[in-house]
Amino acid sequence: MAGPRIDEVKDNAFRLPSRLNSTWGGNFTDMVRSTHYLRIIEQERLVENAAKIGAYFLDQLRDLQTEEPLISAARGRGVFLAFDLPDAKTREEFWHGFFNLGVLTLRSGENSIRFRPALDITAGAIDEAMELMHKFCQQRRK
């Protein structure tokens, strides 16, 4: 299938089996890059930020849940958060409404909205997003 030109590459995948067994295995550039990512995560205390800001974000989503009867099951860990809506149609309405106001969310499952912000998100950015989500919910009820 590969033809004779494959033999022009000394360490091709057919001569060096480890070339095919893993996307990241043995890739020096990716190992160096990953080391830098881990150092940044540690130096900038991104795990701690995700825990602290995530708890704040979840509290805000629970407040939204008390205001908007269609929202239920606000949940999450760190900054990976979600809530449910009654059905896929309602979820699509909320997803589009949030998007049109500039709040980027993800669809999850059949009826969930998911949040997956950057690990360095600030309380100010969450406040801004929550203000827009409250605005959508209020407009929707009119």
Short names for language-model regions:
Residues 1-142:
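Conserved N-terminal phosphate-binding loop of PLP-dependent enzymes in the Aspartate aminotransferase
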